[in-house]
């Protein structure tokens, strides 16, 4: 605890808050080019093959970004848009790829939470899902 004389001399220092996604440099999203698209396994106790991509951003920083949703069309040299948001069971993955923008296609046949996965509204002629979720 500082003395009053020390506070008069220097005052209280404000703690600088650390950002969870430093590569975005305070931008909401950033564009980048995929340098490698691969699958990786999550931490214990989970088990899966999570799809991730190594992305070189427009500010020359290279990050690992998660590809959400089922199926994707990304390969090396694909141009992607990334946003912040970590994946809890993948160490070092602190960014998400935005589906449905730039070279990334939206998730096919997605009926719910469509806006999060860049899926268009299904045509009215298609069989509408029954209300009540199968009850």
Curated annotation (Swiss-Prot):
Residues 101-135 are annotated as: Disordered. The keyword RNA-binding applies. One of its GO terms (cellular component) is small ribosomal subunit. PANTHER family: 30S RIBOSOMAL PROTEIN S12 FAMILY MEMBER. Part of the 30S ribosomal subunit. Contacts proteins S8 and S17. May interact with IF1 in the 30S initiation complex. With S4 and S5 plays an important role in translational accuracy. Belongs to the universal ribosomal protein uS12 family. This is Small ribosomal subunit protein uS12. The lineage of its organism: Bacteria, Pseudomonadati, Chlorobiota, Chlorobiia, Chlorobiales. The gene is rpsL.
